């Protein structure tokens, strides 16, 4: 897995005002469903959708990678984009606080991204 994709995803999230962008390196944790999670939150449904759409567009444009599966765009309380080795959850702020995905993998190496 190339770190370029994580940077492209983080930049795409930040371009559309994603908040608290954090990636988790799950490779050392043998039970994880992917190598990386990169998560953020936003304050509104339109913002969640805009972030997810921008991630998809930037990954095609800069990494030549299409999303394998998308879930959650119907109600957009959260949207998950699956790229196989990378899972990209985008939450509305209260849902991120409720699900606390980062706490599931507290041992994972974390990287925070900022503008």
Specify the residue positions occupied by each region the protein language model found.
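Polybasic/polar functional segments that serve as interface/processing modules
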Residues: 1-33, 42-79, 93-94, 104-115
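Active-site beta-strand termini and strand-to-loop segments that position acidic
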Residues: 81-83
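Switch/connector loops and helix/strand junctions flanking conserved nucleotide-binding motifs
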Residues: 97-100
């Amino acid at each position: 897995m190339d770190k370029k994709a994580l940077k492209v995803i983080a930049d795409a999230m930040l371009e559309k005002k994603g908040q608290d962008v954090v990636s988790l390196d799950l490779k050392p944790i043998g039970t994880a469903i992917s190598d990386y999670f990169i998560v953020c939150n936003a304050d509104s449904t339109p913002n969640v959708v805009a972030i997810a759409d921008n991630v998809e567009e930037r990954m095609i444009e800069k990494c030549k990678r299409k999303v394998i599966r998308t879930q959650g765009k119907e109600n957009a309380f959260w949207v998950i984009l699956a790229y196989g080795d990378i899972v990209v959850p985008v939450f509305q702020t209260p849902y991120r606080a409720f699900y606390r995905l980062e706490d599931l993998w507290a041992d994972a190496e974390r990287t925070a991204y900022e503008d």
